[in-house]
Amino acid sequence: MKRLTLLTLACIFFINVQARAEITPQLMQEWSRQPSNVQWDLYYQRTNIQVVDTLPWVSPSLADTWAYTTMNVQNGYVQSVDMVIKRGYESALTHEVGHALSNAGYTPYWWCYQPCFIQIWQAERYNNVMMAQGFDDIREYFACAYDMYIRYPQVLKRANPMTYNYIIVCLQNT
């Protein structure tokens, strides 16, 4: 609770500092579309706890990376958490965690855009019928591969061995 209070105070300070900045009509429009930083922070903390409690294979650090990289960019994170917690659609969540893992490798490229992974994707993308939606988009392929790694590791290892090994390397280095 103490940590959350300090975090909330830090967010309030950040909001006050932002209020002193030049407020443009574009900035006002952007703020009106998004919850306040405090609301985001509380939602972010609660959601990460729900993800880790619901799916024990998601480490707190990966859940944190996932929420941080996807929450403000796309609605998939919010929708997939809702689907998993309320409806039990675990594959939607593992797919979104796969996107977060692909975004975690900031060594000149995300994991899914590393030159070696592009070669793996070109070689193996048509090997696995279960990953059909990932054929043409490298980010979708990576997310589908992570989902397969979690739910059907032996199928992925047989059909896409280089992808399987690459996912292991990404997890070890994230």
Over which residues does each language-model region extend?
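Active-site-flanking segments in enzyme catalytic domains
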Residues: L42-T174
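Sec-dependent N-terminal signal peptides
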Residues: L4-F13
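Boundary at the C-terminal end of the N-terminal hydrophobic targeting segment
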Residues: V17-A21
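Extended hydrophobic/Leu-rich segments
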Residues: L9, I23, L27-W31, W66-V73, ...
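Zn2+-dependent metallopeptidase catalytic core
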Residues: I23-N48
